[in-house]
Amino acid sequence: KVYGRCELAAAMKRLGLDNYRGYSLGNWVCAAKFESNFNTHATNRNTDGSTDYGILQINSRWWCNDGRTPGSRNLCHIPCSALLSSDITASVNCAKKIVSDGNGMNAWVAWRNRCKGTDVNAWTRGCRL
């Protein structure tokens, strides 16, 4: 599923991401835009053999199990396929664990490069939330 900007903001808010660990909703919407272009089915292979999955491009080396990543930790205790669902609950729950891990949203390279330090409120502007 490819979410609309405001549709995704509403879903993320409903699932408790707004101001989770101090990150406003705009940060999460911005991260999803530049990680997956709001597409829940996005997958990208990395040079180390791991793969990033779903709307927030969650990595199989640390966070989920795809059965093909050597030394996978699966810290969210989920199959990576769960992160490709049109229902973003699994992705959001895992993202909460990731953002609580010490580096905050810096864990997402696209957030660090494209969202951090910008006016992220623009991502939720005009949305009925």
UniProtKB/Swiss-Prot annotation:
Cystines in this chain: C6-C127, C30-C115, C64-C80, C76-C94
Pfam families per record: Lys
Catalytic activity: Hydrolysis of (1->4)-beta-linkages between N-acetylmuramic acid and N-acetyl-D-glucosamine residues in a peptidoglycan and between N-acetyl-D-glucosamine residues in chitodextrins
Compartments, as annotated in UniProt: Secreted
Source organism superkingdom: Eukaryota
MF terms in GO: lysozyme activity
Example GO BP: killing of cells of another organism
Keywords: Antimicrobial, Bacteriolytic enzyme, Disulfide bond, Glycosidase, Hydrolase, Secreted
C-type lysozyme domain boundaries: 1-129
Classification via PROSITE patterns: GLYCOSYL_HYDROL_F22_1, GLYCOSYL_HYDROL_F22_2
GO cellular component entries: extracellular region
InterPro entries per UniProt: Glyco_hydro_22, Glyco_hydro_22_CS, Glyco_hydro_22_lys, Lysozyme-like_dom_sf
Enzyme Commission number, as recorded: 3.2.1.17
Protein task: Lysozymes have primarily a bacteriolytic function; those in tissues and body fluids are associated with the monocyte-macrophage system and enhance the activity of immunoagents.
Extra information: Lysozyme C is capable of both hydrolysis and transglycosylation; it also shows a slight esterase activity. It acts rapidly on both peptide-substituted and unsubstituted peptidoglycan, and slowly on chitin oligosaccharides.
Family, per entry: Belongs to the glycosyl hydrolase 22 family.
Quaternary structure and partners: Monomer.
Stated name of the protein: Lysozyme C
Gene: LYZ
